[in-house]
Amino acid sequence: MFKRRLCAALLSTLAIVTPVVSADTQVKIIAFNDFHGNLFSAGNVADVPVGGVDVFAAYVDKLRAQNPYNVVVSAGDLIGASPLVSSLFHDEPTIEVMNRLRLDFNAVGNHEFDEGTEELLRMQHGGCHPEDVNSCQGEKVGTPVPFEGAQFGFLAANVLNQQTGDTLFPAYGTKAFGDHEIAFIGLTLEGTPSIVLAEGIRTLQFLDEADTINALIPEIRARGVEAIVVLIHEGGLRPSAAGVYNSCLDDITSSDLVMPIAEIVSQLDDAVDLVITGHSPVAYNCRIPNSVGRLIPVTHAQGAASVVTDIDVLLDDVSGDIVDITLNNVLVEQNESVIPVEGITRLIHAYSDLAQPLADRVIGVMTAAVTRSNDPTNGQSDAGNMIADAQLAATRSPDTGGAQLALMNSGGVRANMGAELYPGHITYGAIYSMQPFGNSLVTMTYTAAQLKEVLEQQFPECLGRRQRTLLQVSAGFSYQFDESAPACNRIIEMSLNGTRLVEGGQLIDPEKTLRVTVNNFIADVGMDLPLWAWAQIGSPGYWISTRWSNILCNTAGPTMLTIPTLPVLANPV
């Protein structure tokens, strides 16, 4: 096989041993990704009720029963951006559930770093949160105290401690089946620093995915392991259709598609047999050419335990290499034939009971269903605009920042407040599911020229941007763009409260100052937009530490929320 020679530091591994078998050996790999602490069902797929981790566990057990030689793996974002029932307890419930589901390996994803490096290490090794009394609730729910930590292995091949050069977690893990082993290399996307808070990962370095994988191949093969599987928290976007979760577009590697994983796979050593991915909002089951043009399987389940990938691999008895692979994405459908795993049901309901008083607290009244679905033309959503409006309202007063507009990242909107809540009260739990991060708000001063430049960088080809990523904007601020114009020159109109800032692509007053509110993720160079770096010297930001739900509350009782009217952005006619 083709080998790519790269220097590699000695990296630790995890090893699991299973009973000895003979002849060609079939092994079942049970894979999922982007669980995000969804202990209960996150909704439907094509109008079919799916998920709930106790139902998911029943599917895993059913697949396990088909073959005693099995392994369960996750391709990242197991925790982070979680509903209240998990995140209120710092995702300890999710780790405890996965221990009981008998997960073997989890490759870190970007959301594993949401609460910083030390908290992620606590997820692996256990112990109570140093500050929050909501941690270590085992006595009330029937789990060990202090928090037991993960009994499965986190993997982080491309995440290094900058001081020591060691990986944060083992680069790969192995599981033995008779005389042979399968190696699982686990890693997150190299771009993780651009989508998590920098403060929590300042001691870490994130390396190129393909280079990291290829550098490990000689070490793994020197151990006599030929079967190599990659668990990577990186994928891609493709046009989605309702209920499509087990297919792949013929032109999956087309330059017209945003498919970062295709670029990574195209560089992989031919020793890699299978790539299990995460990070994308859709499921796929593909075969993508590697560095020598051989098509290798690349899979992605749908998040929130709604789809599980059932993979059968055949190990050659002589070489130990994978000689055959079959794959199938299975919908985790709720129906009468599926009996949820009782112990897991009991555990998640115990945590739900603890969270219920807070989750049920009414903080507002629905005046319309609010969704996070982005308009394909202007990139805006009802939910994103409403959050931006709330952030502007919280920081408009001179005492709280003097903001004139607010910008919100669409990736920070994690759930809908759908028709099932309308008409009716909005609860803390519903708001928390929509905005689970607990970010702070920061208001800073920019010139009109700086703001225009930030907006230009939302579009592909401007200063290395690979895909369109549009910020959600507050009411009163609008702009128009022409995507056919040259890179970094696409903003043709920009206005604030009826006052023109840009007309015909030209700034009217480049030095005009504006007070802009964003969350601290965006301010901390999130999305690779230089909002913090460009804040004017001598104009410090005003920080307000609050969850979005607090912005919507008042002492008089439930607040009527008016949903912004779309569009606030549009392509020019």
Residue spans for each PLM region:
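Serine/threonine-rich low-complexity intrinsically disordered regions
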Residues: 1, 240, 253-254, 260, ...
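Catalytic centers of hydrolytic enzymes
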Residues: 25-28, 37-46, 50-65, 95, ...
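Acidic, metal/ion-coordinating pockets
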Residues: 23-334, 382-393, 406, 462, ...
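Gram-negative bacterial Sec-dependent N-terminal signal peptides
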Residues: 2-22
